[in-house]
C-alpha cells in the first residue's frame, strides 16, 4: 500500500500561475514573482484553479519536499494577492537614532552615539518606510521581506556592551 502524499493548493480569483522549465510564476494584483522549484522525483501540475504537488515515491525525503514546495507556492500566491508586511520599532534610551532610506540601503545614524553610520541592505523589490519610531517593510516576496528585516535587526546588534542594560536597536514587533 502506497501512501498518497500529494498536496493541492487552491488559486484565488485574480491570480494566474504558470510553470515553465521548473520556474513557477505567479501573477496577481500586487505584481509578479518567480521561483525555481526542482527536486528529483517531485512533480508540479498546474490545473485550472489549482496546483498539485506530488512525488513519485512516498519516502520521507520526498514527503518533506512536497510539503516544502506546497508552502513555497502558497507564499508566492499570497504575496501577489495580498503582499507581506513586517513592522519594526526603533528603541533608544539616550542617543536618538536617525534612520533613513537611501535607494537599496537603510542608513542608521547616531546608533549608541557612534560617529559612523551603519548600513543595512534592502533585498529585492522590498519597500521600506520610516515614520517616527516605526519602520514598515512591505513586499510581495516573503523571503525578501524577512531577510530585509533580519538585516536591519542584525545591524543594530550590540556586541561590546551588556545587552540587558543597553537595549537600543531596531526590533521586529509584528510580521503579517
From Swiss-Prot:
Domain of life of the source: Archaea
Any one Gene Ontology BP term: cytoplasmic translation
Cellular-component GO terms for this entry: cytosolic large ribosomal subunit
Keywords assigned by UniProt, alphabetized: Ribonucleoprotein, Ribosomal protein, RNA-binding, rRNA-binding
Keyword presence, Oxidoreductase: no
GO terms, molecular function: rRNA binding; structural constituent of ribosome
Pfam family, one: Ribosomal_L6
Keyword Ribosomal protein appears in the UniProt entry: yes
Subunit and interaction comment: Part of the 50S ribosomal subunit.
Entry similarity comment: Belongs to the universal ribosomal protein uL6 family.
NCBIfam families in alphabetical order: PRK05518.1, uL6_arch
Function: This protein binds to the 23S rRNA, and is important in its secondary structure. It is located near the subunit interface in the base of the L7/L12 stalk, and near the tRNA binding site of the peptidyltransferase center.
Protein name: Large ribosomal subunit protein uL6
Lineage of source species: Archaea, Methanobacteriati, Methanobacteriota, Stenosarchaea group, Methanomicrobia
Gene: rpl6
Amino acid at each position: 500500500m502506497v501512501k498518497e502524499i500529494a498536496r493541492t493548493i487552491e488559486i484565488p480569483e485574480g491570480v494566474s500561475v504558470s510553470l515553465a522549465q521548473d520556474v513557477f510564476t505567479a501573477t496577481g494584483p500586487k505584481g509578479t514573482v518567480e521561483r525555481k522549484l526542482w527536486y528529483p522525483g517531485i512533480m508540479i501540475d498546474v490545473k485550472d484553479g489549482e496546483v498539485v504537488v506530488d512525488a513519485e515515491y512516498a519516502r520521507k525525503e520526498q514527503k518533506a519536499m512536497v510539503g516544502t514546495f506546497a508552502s513555497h507556492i502558497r507564499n508566492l500566491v499570497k504575496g501577489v494577492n495580498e503582499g507581506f508586511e513586517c513592522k519594526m520599532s526603533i528603541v533608544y534610551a539616550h542617543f536618538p537614532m536617525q534612520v533613513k532610506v537611501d535607494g537599496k540601503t537603510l542608513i542608521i545614524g547616531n546608533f549608541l552615539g557612534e560617529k559612523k553610520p551603519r548600513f543595512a541592505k534592502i533585498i529585492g523589490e522590498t519597500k521600506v518606510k520610516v515614520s517616527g519610531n516605526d519602520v514598515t517593510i512591505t513586499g510581495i516576496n516573503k523571503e525578501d521581506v524577512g531577510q530585509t528585516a533580519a538585516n536591519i535587526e542584525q545591524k543594530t546588534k550590540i556586541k561590546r556592551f551588556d545587552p540587558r542594560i543597553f537595549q537600543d536597536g531596531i526590533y521586529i514587533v509584528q510580521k503579517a
